[in-house]
From Swiss-Prot:
Enzyme Commission number(s) from the entry: 3.5.2.7
Pathway membership, UniProt: Amino-acid degradation; L-histidine degradation into L-glutamate; N-formimidoyl-L-glutamate from L-histidine: step 3/3
Annotated keywords: Cytoplasm, Histidine metabolism, Hydrolase, Iron, Metal-binding, Zinc
Organism name: Polaromonas sp. (strain JS666 / ATCC BAA-500)
Record's catalysed reaction(s): 4-imidazolone-5-propanoate + H2O = N-formimidoyl-L-glutamate
Superkingdom, taxonomy of origin: Bacteria
Amino-acid positions noted as binding Fe(3+) in the UniProt annotation, renumbered to this chain: 78, 80, 248, 323
UniProt cofactor(s): Zn(2+); Fe(3+)
Enzyme class label: hydrolase
Any single Gene Ontology cellular-component annotation: cytoplasm
Name of protein: Imidazolonepropionase
Note on cofactor: Binds 1 zinc or iron ion per subunit.
MF terms (GO), sorted A to Z: imidazolonepropionase activity; iron ion binding; zinc ion binding
Length: 425
């Protein structure tokens, strides 16, 4: 396969069916109406019923969608994609009955990945992460968040974030980087959590932000990780640097982290299996997105469901993500997560599809550019040979896109995908 830029998607994409809820505004385009999308210079210039296509676009090339269903490009808003090694041994431990906390106390968990990540060079981490990203892109993902948090020292956190930036450049995909230095206490700081938080706030975060490597800041607030007070210190440091925050919140217990995050205008609170009504109310008031991570729930064999009905009643937007990581969610299909969100968490199909598009984009602060189709937005959309949009959540991850337009270029046609590879539309 020769390496060259993806072919431009400029032209008229016609004979399409719009997924319900796909449009960024309230344009009255019925989902059963044959639709067209006009792309020029990598952006959507017009979208609507084919019969209403303005004559001024008639000279553009035409792409026959063949009646395909079109959705916005998918958004995976919570991943730990860059790391060294894997943790299959912990899978066996959990099958034998070990809890999340017991695995961590036995030397596994996050610290196990820290050792492997520190031992790997930047190029090695890129080589390991690239096939993972390719699998997600093959699902129709057009934007992705990648966290640090397996370095837990300045040079190693920098290494992870640099790899994340490189992945975005190599694959032509929107990557939002999140600094998760407060993911776990590194072994060399055992018993000195405040000293480590001081390092995170005073040295690591300012340095990485100055290098342009940080788009947002996250903390794991939990009894086996960092306290509310320590979390707030990190949020204050992020606030001083003008960076948005998010939180691993209420996964194993109700720490009150969601309410704290909402006070800082958090983009999202993620996991939230033990989220309280007070946390829900605070998130609603702040406009904070609830990110559901069914892969981790499934892998950990959790039985405490997130409060879906209460979130729904409160009108808190719910996103769905893979939470790809080597320990608790080795998942690489966002469509499978949509299915699991429906079957395990009882989301409706429209909620699940909004969760991997519109609401996921909002969880990354990308709501004006990603997750919905609209005039002036970058051309990020996916064509599917499906009869009904419900099939996106119905199949157990086996449904491959027909065509992916990512960042205004035809990134996939068929099942082939590679960084900067030319694929004929």
């Amino acid at each position: 396969m020769t390496t060259a830029p993806h072919p431009a998607a400029d032209g008229i994409w016609e004979h399409l069916r719009l997924m319900p809820g796909a449009l960024a505004d309230d344009s009255p385009v019925a989902t059963n109406t044959e639709a067209a999308i006009v792309v020029t210079e990598g952006r959507i210039r017009w979208i609507g019923a084919s019969a209403a296509l303005p004559a001024g676009f008639s000279a553009l090339p035409r792409f026959d969608g063949g009646g395909a269903l079109v959705t916005p490009g998918l958004v995976d808003c919570h991943t730990h994609l860059v790391y060294g090694g894997q943790r299959a041994n912990e899978f066996a431990m959990r099958l034998a009955g070990a809890s999340y906390e017991e695995v961590a106390k036995a030397g596994g968990g996050i610290v196990s990945s820290v050792r492997a990540t520190r031992a790997a060079g930047e190029d090695e981490l890129f080589a390991q992460a690239a096939p993972r990203l390719e699998q997600l892109l093959a699902d129709g993902v057009c934007a992705i968040e990648i966290k640090s948090g397996y370095g837990l020292a300045l040079e190693h956190e920098r290494k992870q974030l640099r790899v994340a930036r490189r992945l975005g450049e190599a694959y032509g995909v929107t990557v939002r980087t999140t600094f998760l230095g407060a993911h776990a206490l590194p072994p060399e700081y055992a018993g000195r959590s405040q000293d480590y938080i001081d390092l995170v706030c005073r040295e690591m975060l300012p340095a990485l932000a100055a290098e342009g490597l940080v788009d947002a800041v996250d903390v794991f607030c939990e009894r086996i990780a960092f306290s509310l007070s320590e979390t707030e210190q990190v949020f204050q440091a992020a606030q001083r640097l003008g960076l948005p925050v998010k939180l691993h919140a209420e996964q194993l217990s109700d720490m009150g982290g969601a309410a704290l995050a909402a006070r800082y205008g958090a983009l999202s609170c993620d996991h939230i299996e033990h989220l309280s009504q007070a946390g829900i109310d605070a998130m609603r008031a702040a406009g904070t997105v609830a990110v559901l991570l069914p892969g981790a729930y499934y892998t950990l064999r959790d039985t405490h469901l997130p409060p879906i009905a209460a979130l729904r009643e409160a009108g808190v937007p719910m996103a769905v993500s893979t939470d790809h990581n080597p320990g608790t969610s080795p998942a690489l299909s966002l469509l499978l997560m949509a299915n699991m969100a429906c079957t395990l968490f009882r989301l409706t199909v429209p909620e699940a599809l909004a969760g991997i598009t519109r609401h996921a984009a909002r969880a990354l602060g990308l709501q004006d550019t990603h997750g919905a189709l609209g005039v002036g937005r970058p051309a990020n959309f996916v064509l599917w040979q499906l009869n009904d949009s419900a099939e996106l959540a119905y199949w157990l991850g086996q449904q491959a896109p027909r065509t992916i337009v990512r960042q205004g270029r035809v990134a996939l046609d068929g099942l082939q995908i590679a960084p900067n590879a030319r694929i004929t539309p």
